[in-house]
A protein has these predicted regions:
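Flexible, substrate/cofactor-facing loop regions flanked by secondary structure
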Residues: 150-157, 161-189, 194-199
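Hydrophobic alpha-helical transmembrane segments in multi-pass integral membrane proteins
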Residues: 44-54, 102-117, 154-172, 218-234, ...
Length: 281
């Protein structure tokens, strides 16, 4: 069950990245965050109403969920910005390095993954180094890379903590907190930029809502799948499988947008995928 859920999350998040890229480049990061987080929050509320599930009263679990929310907001803001200014086929694999952070934290907290998983974590780090090295047009290729790296650390810590939360709270209640915090942060950022008159202009109104609905649907499916997965399997394994979303994103970016990377960077992308696969063994 955990393997299936991890792969489903990977497929869904990989598709989400493409929708996010299209949306942020048409309405900017702030508007995209408000639109998508509001849609996701409404979806989560509908799921909770349908479930009739009573939330836990354990204050420690709620504090841990709040910590997850902080990491989620930080990782999301950094990743949205990376998608807006960077190359999709480059920043997405780097962002998927959150699996390394999760694996290391899980190991430190008592999980004992196989030796292949530890080797995969090391290989993945080497792949990130290769991808972030630019030998040609440095300004074009390195744009968004620092944001993607920061996002990987934030999401890695969040996914590790969710492994302790979802077995007691279920797959949906933690998402409510994450969405509320993400929407609050998005609205705050939007209002500041609006007051400073620094909002990005809307360039294509016709495709805003289809792209927003695409993000809401695929992102919600991915989150539910991940949370169900970590209830039945090691957090390290499910997170590593979910991080394969970057492979889906790169294939779509290569097929639809014809994004190009230097040969050494493609080598780094391949090494990242190898590391992710080893972590999941």
């Amino acid at each position: 069950m955990g393997i299936f859920c991890g792969l489903l999350a990977a497929l869904s998040w990989g598709t989400t990245d493409v929708f996010i890229m299209g949306l942020t480049r048409r309405v900017g990061t702030s508007r995209a965050l408000v639109y998508t987080q509001l849609g996701c929050l409404l979806t989560i509320c509908l799921l909770l109403l349908a479930q009739h599930q009573t939330p836990t009263s354990n204050p420690k679990l709620w504090l841990l969920v709040l910590g997850c929310g902080v990491c989620h907001v930080a990782g999301m803001l950094l990743m949205y910005r990376a998608f807006e200014i960077g190359s999709l086929a480059l920043v997405s694999p780097i962002g998927s390095g959150f699996a390394v952070v999760t694996a290391l934290l899980a190991l430190a907290s008592g999980e004992r993954p196989a030796a292949a998983a530890l080797l995969g974590a090391l290989i993945l780090c080497c792949g990130v180094v290769l991808v972030t090295r630019s030998h040609s047009d440095q300004k074009a290729t390195m744009a968004g890379v620092p944001h993607a790296i920061g996002s990987a650390f934030a999401f890695g810590a969040m996914f590790w903590a969710l492994g302790f939360v979802t077995p007691h709270m279920g797959p949906v209640w933690p998402l409510l907190v994450l969405r509320l915090m993400a929407l609050s942060s998005a609205v705050f950022t939007f209002l500041i930029q609006k007051r400073r008159n620094t909002l990005e202009p809307i360039t294509d109104k016709k495709r805003i809502w289809p792209l927003t609905l695409g993000v809401v649907a695929t992102d919600t499916i991915a989150w539910i799948a991940f949370n169900v997965g970590v209830r039945s399997d090691y957090t390290t394994i499910v997170t590593a499988l979910a991080s394969l979303y970057s492979a889906v994103t790169v294939v779509i970016a290569w097929g639809l947008f014809r994004e190009r990377l230097a040969p050494s960077q493609w080598t780094g992308v391949a090494v990242i995928f190898l590391g992710i696969l080893l972590v999941s063994i």
